[in-house]
């Protein structure tokens, strides 16, 4: 299956070749997520987050672009507010910044996560951190 991203990224239209959806082990996530696709050398991961699911705190060597396709997403940088994103919205996390992202506590959704370079995985996001009051982007 070929899935075209409905946006222009740094001057290029990217085409994603989808793999068979597969549930992921929970090593770097809390809750049920399904990675729908991934492409090297950079990564365009298409991920379905069930309600309440989220990543661990992590750092991207070269930053990360998060595009929300459907549902509601949350993103927080260390020391900053939780940002709420809706379908069609995007957020950029700069290189070297610790952050987490996932679904809202009561609503899941899908995201395109565009990254290059390494990822350093940190601590799990606590329930107290996750259930903070989000702000709209």
Locate each region found by the language model:
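A short, N-terminal "cap"/entry segment at the start of jelly-roll beta-barrel domains
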Residues: 2-46, 56, 121-137
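Short histidine-centered beta-strand/loop micro-motifs
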Residues: 36, 55-60, 77, 83-84, ...
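Histidine-centered metal-chelating micro-motifs
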Residues: 54-55, 74, 91, 95-101
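Short, conserved beta-strand element in jelly-roll/cupin
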Residues: 60-75
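Short acidic-glycine-tyrosine-enriched beta hairpin
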Residues: 79-95
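Ligand-binding loop in jelly-roll beta-barrel domains
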Residues: 95-120
